[in-house]
Amino acid sequence: MTIDTSDLLNSILGSLSRIDYIKPEEVPNIPLYMDQVTTFMDAQLASSKRYPEDKILTKTMINNYAKNDLLPPPLKKKYSKEHLLVLVFIYYFKSILSITDIQALLKPITDTYFSSSENLSLEDIYNEVFRLEKSQVDILKEDITNRYRLSRETFQDAPEKDQEFLKTFSFICLLSFDVYVKKQLIESLIDDLHQDTKEKKKK
């Protein structure tokens, strides 16, 4: 079995260098109807699709988010700029977190900062978080490269015809372990935040 993992790695690292996010100034300042929202999100996040037929967001998804308190309800069937920023958070979170966890994480944010007159706006939070994400790209590239090198050192004594597959399997396991540990940490942090929120409501 032949797998050109070096080309794949270079492709992944190259795509990491091109990672961008939807900047608030790119989000329309006028309220949008559902069809306009799905069209906008699909155009902006198309590069993150695994397969061309994948859907970024559908009407059903958005309705479910509103029903489950992940997204504040639209005003007269229209979605504001803040709605779209929340949808971006949901889009990234939903690949690793349950709907319940996303709700626990975002509800305090939307309750406090959505359409708020606070000094800190939802747009400010969005900008600050994604600014941090951009700063992590080089660190992430180095970490992935190191894991790749480690995986290439495994299964040296395996039959030659199986080595490439087994080394790739090893690389996937190394990456998966990292994801598993971080997911456990994220879930623990969300549980702590949720508990703090419940205790504050009791007071």
Model-derived features: positions:
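Intrinsically disordered, low-complexity, charge-dense segments enriched in Lys/Arg
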Residues: P108-K203
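Basic helix-turn-helix/winged-helix DNA-binding cores
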Residues: T2-T112
